[in-house]
């Protein structure tokens, strides 16, 4: 009966098979399985089937499971950090970990307000540890606990503790805290849904180009999938999310008093994704529009915005001189759907939107990302992973001969033999131009 609860998918079949195996083991025991346990397992199946399977992130958590290292999941609010840990928690329970071995605390929940002090938190958790077994501790938005690093550090010293924490602000791993935890943590950077993950919510025969248009017009935030057919609800949700991030994670933490000026900077960055931006130029632009602002204030605002993960900054790299450049960066939004909420942009600028989508996918895949410069030409992305590099150009279309030439020239000028890619929305077969791989970007986004 349990197998019938799961639809004909690999994910459902796998979970149902685990549950069936569990039932068979219990039948061989002295006592019959309790009905409540069966119902619990059924609820776990239902929970898993409602979720988009975030395979890469789940694999990372499994890789570091039971290792003496703190798993720190970071990312913007509502990108799925809590859901990811909940999925992993349920996976542990299905695999035989007892509920007594798991402690889960969300510090945005008022019920957990008594533990917003490191001493109270440590005392409570230690008192409820299951002796003689591994204990799995899940702490959501841990940065809200005053002195949280002391509690984490003390719990880390216990042999039977496996720690998982989340945070929506880079403060979690900044300054003294990062120094204190050096060598004791691994950061798992979580983003809203990738295009490939988004496709899991759609029929297998969905039109891929229509799906991409929906992806960039609506949003990649997980909750939007539940309301995506109601445009007004999507806009209201994203507006509320944006306001929460700006007011709670930026204004409150940085004690910013001129909120209107901050929002002017936000709108400038959102309107200029994919363009080289210099702090002084932003300051001068604001001043020319009648909003006088000092360069150091712009710099502080941008720092606060990137720390809240709403924007990502990408420095420039001289591909020939092999060194970082001190001036000029590009900024990308964590979700292109937020752009219409921020500045009312409707359509247009699809080239920079595509570039933003590619940047986020590269960030998910790991490595240091830079904007490349070679002579007077620009390479959209240089990705460095250890000793390896890869170069990427992104273009809506290169079917025009002049456009093709313009996009290929910077890649052809690079004096090394690392992989080079030209990603476009032209739905053409893969072709190589003197070693440069041209690929349909929607296939690349799906790892095809």
Residue ranges of each PLM-predicted region?
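Hydrophobic positions on the alpha1 helix immediately C-terminal to the Walker A/P-loop
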Residues: 84
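Interdomain motor-coupling "hinge/lid" segment immediately C-terminal to the ATP-binding subdomain
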Residues: 36, 168-170, 174-276, 309
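Hydrophobic anchor at the beta1->P-loop junction of P-loop NTPases
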Residues: 73
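Accessory nucleic acid-recognition modules appended to NTPase machines
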Residues: 231-389
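Pre-Walker A adenine-sensing motif
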Residues: 52-65
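Conserved lysine of the Walker
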Residues: 81
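Structural recognition of the conserved hydrophobic beta-strand(s) that form the central parallel beta-sheet
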Residues: 162-168
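Short glycine-rich substrate-engagement loop in P-loop NTPases that contacts/grips substrate
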Residues: 104-132
